Structure formats: structure tokens, C-alpha cells
Amino acid sequence: MILIVVSFCQSADLFSQISLQIGGGLGYISPAGDYGGSTIDFYDGTKYGMSSGFNYHAKARVGLLGFNLFGIIEYSTVSGDGESEAGQGEVENSHSLFSIKAGPEFNLSPPLSPVGFYIDGFVSVNTFSGTVKFQGVAEVPSGEYDLESATRFGVGAGGGVLLDLIPIVTFDIGVHYNLYNVLGQTYTGTTTNPKRLDAYTSLNDDKDPLYGTDDDIYIIENTRAINAWQFTLTAMIGI
């Protein structure tokens, strides 16, 4: 009987040290590396030509002994538009990105302070879709085309500031660097599309295996990294 009581008390004490927060918010995305560049780079097959975008997300945080675990579901959009070559053609390129992220978070907050800090790391599953539009572009028929949906696995890290400015609600201001396509890179091509259209209607973050056989059609020479900085504001409510 004594052992049961002691076990119950220990379980209750452990449970009291576990916290749960849920919330949602908005974010700004700044593509980096091969995900950035210009639409001329996109037409040349070297980068994606994305400028910036926004995201909407839901976040959950579970506080354990000494550290937290967090999970995020987010929907992001990025786009770029401009010329295909200097003074020629029009290109509009947009991606929609659905991501699920999870990982550990280490709280660096001073005791009883309304301002806290954290650092974290995560793994992610990222699904891309989108459209690309060409007008008066050499080697590609004019029109709007769908991007074939593709899933990649990534990682990321960052940190943030926690502000307890009003009762119950914590404002989470985060900065993170995302590597969206660490695993799963591939080139997708068909023989039915005209000219170099295949290069643009799939994510094609791996080298075209036919690169070098025809410079007008097979243009993707290298693997392309899809990375981005992300700045977020999330309102979290304790449960």
C-alpha cells in the first residue's frame, strides 16, 4: 500500500512538471542559395528564382524535464517573376510548400523572467506544388503549367525569444534556417513535353542525367539546394 501511494505521488509530481502550449501565427520566408536568384537563373536551370513569401502555421510545445519538444504544421508560398533573358520573355514562378516539422527545443529562460530564449533543431517533411507561366520565352511554349507535386525530407535549426506580456498567452518570435531537400533529390523527365519544358514542370533538384547531350533541352547541370530563412511570430496558449 505504501509503495502504491509513493508511486502515485511521484507520478503526480512528474505530471506537474510537464507543460503544454498550442498556438498559431504568421511568418516571412527569404529563399537562400539555389532557392533564390533571378528568373534568368531559373530559365538557365541554375536556381529557382524565388524572391520571398509568407507562411501560416500551427505550433505545439510540450515542456519536459530540462527541455521541450515541439511540432509545427505550416503552409508557405514563395514566388518570383521577371525576364527569361535580358530584355526578353516573361516568367512567373510560384511554389506552395506544406511542411511538418518536429524536434527538441532547449529553453534558456531566466527564472521568473517575462522574457525567455530558446534554441532548437528539427527534421521536416516538405511537399512542394506550384505553377510556372511563360510568355514569349525561347525554347518553351507560352502558357501556364502546373508543377508536379514532390516530397522532400529536410532539417533545420534556429532559436527565438519568448515574451510573456499578457496572462496565459506567450508570444514566440522565431528565426530559423531551413534545408528543405536534404534527402529525396531527384530529376523527373518525360519524352512527351516539347523542348526544355520538363526542366520547369517538376522540382528537379537533382542533375539531369542527360545534361550535356543537348544544351537547348537538358539544362540542369547540378544538384540544387532548397534553403530559406524563416522569421515567425506565434501566439501560444498554455493548457
List the predicted regions and their residue ranges.
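Predominantly the C-terminal beta-signal and adjacent terminal strand-loop region
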Residues: 166-239
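Transmembrane beta-barrel strands of outer-membrane/channel proteins
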Residues: 22-28, 71-77, 119-127, 159-161, ...
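Short glycine/proline- and aromatic-enriched beta-strand/turn motifs that initiate or cap beta-hairpins
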Residues: 14-68, 223-239
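Transmembrane beta-barrel architecture of outer-membrane proteins
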Residues: 51-57, 95-101, 152-156, 170, ...
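Gram-negative (and chloroplast) outer-membrane scaffold detector with strong preference
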Residues: 61-140, 148, 165, 229-239
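Membrane-spanning beta-strand positions in outer-membrane beta-barrel proteins
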Residues: 19-21, 68, 116-118, 154-156, ...
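Extracytoplasmic loops and strand-loop junctions of Gram-negative outer membrane beta-barrel proteins
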Residues: 38-44, 84-88, 139-145, 212-219
